[in-house]
Design a protein with these regions (language model features):
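Glycine-rich phosphate/pyrophosphate-handling loop used in enzymes and phosphotransfer proteins
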Residues: 1-275
């Protein structure tokens, strides 16, 4: 599966051809300061269930504790094994939306901790043969699903933040005797969309078409194992297109890890008696 990668560095380093580390826009810092000021003046509410006087209640926090579960309904991911930490329903949905849309940046540390936990749990989902093949490659890339241009301009790189956290958890969980360097690298960019950049107001077919278009790969990945990371999976089409792009560039996609998985639409069908 691997092609004689160079010796592992003593600490993670960017791959050749990657741009410098992400720069956080000044607007993001200003927003954070304003939110901190508002938190002093306004009473806090749980981002999940709305309970007063707490930013995140213990019950909602426990929903991010795992364990990891396979996501069989992500048909769009093809044969890529997808695992999720929790279900994208109820309070979890409110948590993720609040965090990724910028209204609850105070959840960042909580989500990072959830990502680290997912990274620590993921090696347990692997068969021994697969784990051995990954270790022999000496490097494992943790690659986030690509963010759109608007989110990049705002500095809200949710999937990239999660990937960083997953990589930290993975590095701690992997057996110490295995000479494996775990690298989090944001090397995918979305392909130009058909029509306007924003997906709102578009038909479901057009949205699926845009998501399924393979992204661009910015760095050499031939012979390297890759774990894809995203915040939410619904149909799996985004993860599937990312895997196809990476595999076309010679990478070995070993799986995908998400914070939450939307339930299967088939599981939500309600049968009305007498109809």
């Amino acid at each position: 599966m691997c092609s004689n990668p160079p010796p592992s560095p003593s600490r993670p380093a960017p791959l050749p051809g990657l741009l410098p580390a992400r720069l956080r826009p000044l607007a993001s810092t200003t927003t954070s300061l304003l939110q901190e000021a508002a938190s002093v003046l306004l009473p806090a509410r749980c981002a999940g269930c709305g309970t007063w006087e707490t930013r995140l209640c213990l019950q909602c926090r426990s929903l991010l504790a795992g364990p990891l579960a396979p996501v069989p309904q992500a048909d769009g991911a093809g044969d890529l094994p997808v695992h999720a930490l929790t279900s994208y329903t109820g309070p979890v949905r409110a948590l993720v939306l609040g965090w990724k849309n910028g209204g609850r940046e105070d959840l960042t540390q909580t989500m990072r901790e959830a990502g680290e936990r997912a990274g620590q749990l993921w090696p347990r989902t692997l068969e021994a043969t697969t784990a051995g093949q990954i270790a022999r490659c000496s490097r494992l890339l943790v690659v986030p699903a690509p963010s759109g241009p608007t989110r990049r301009l705002r500095g809200r790189l949710v999937a990239a933040d999660l990937a960083d956290a997953v990589a930290r958890g993975l590095a701690r969980a992997w057996p110490e005797h295995a000479d494996l360097t775990v690298l989090s690298t944001d090397l995918l960019r979305r392909a130009p969309q058909i029509g306007a950049a924003h997906q709102s107001g578009r038909s479901a077919r057009r949205r699926r078409s845009n998501r399924a278009r393979p992204p661009r790969v910015l760095a050499p990945v031939a012979g390297l194992p890759v774990l894809l990371v995203d915040d939410v999976v619904t149909t799996g089409s985004t993860l599937g297109s990312c895997a196809r792009a990476l595999e076309s560039a010679g990478a070995w996609c070993v799986g995908a890890l998400v914070l939450a998985a939307a339930p299967s639409p088939r599981a939500q069908v309600t049968v009305v008696p007498g109809r």
